[in-house]
């Protein structure tokens, strides 16, 4: 049996050890850090680029917060208590030993992120009328 197959078999038979890749939350925290990085740098980008509107900034922030909320939702469903990291990991001076937050704390952050995001993401017009595009090419 290949190593990956063994890890999956161990996962399904509840013979789980900490270095089993099927139980790693590293990929979730990579995505969370990317979202936090967007939230950290996007306001500065908008301030420097006159073509990057505040509406676009808010939409991008809402998307990042929504994706971060989804990651935390999956994490607490799987692990219950997880570290709640809301700042981007930039540089080496960051404390990498973050205490695990309670499930309630993480749920409150998920709700806060989604409540904030709903005003900027759900009412956007994502599709362009074909007739508008047609005028561009005539």
Please provide the spans of the model-predicted regions:
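Short glycine/proline- and charge-enriched loop/turn segments
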Residues: 88-95
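Short, well-structured active-site flanking segments
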Residues: 76-88
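Aromatic-lined, polymer-binding surfaces characteristic
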Residues: 130-138
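Conserved, well-structured interaction surfaces
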Residues: 2-79, 95-108, 114-130
């Amino acid at each position: 049996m290949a190593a990956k197959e063994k890890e999956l078999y161990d996962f399904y038979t509840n013979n789980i050890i900490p270095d089993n890749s099927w139980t790693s939350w590293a990929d979730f925290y990579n995505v969370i850090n990317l979202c936090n990085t967007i939230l950290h740098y996007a306001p500065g980008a908008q301030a420097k680029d006159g073509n990057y509107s505040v509406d676009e900034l808010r939409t991008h922030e809402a998307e990042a917060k929504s994706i971060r909320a989804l990651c935390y939702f999956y994490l607490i469903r799987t692990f219950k208590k997880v570290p709640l990291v809301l700042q981007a990991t930039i540089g080496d001076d960051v404390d990498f030993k973050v205490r695990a937050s309670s499930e309630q704390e993480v749920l409150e952050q998920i709700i806060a992120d989604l409540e904030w995001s709903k005003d900027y993401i759900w009412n956007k017009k994502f599709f362009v009328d074909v007739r508008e595009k047609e005028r561009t090419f005539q």
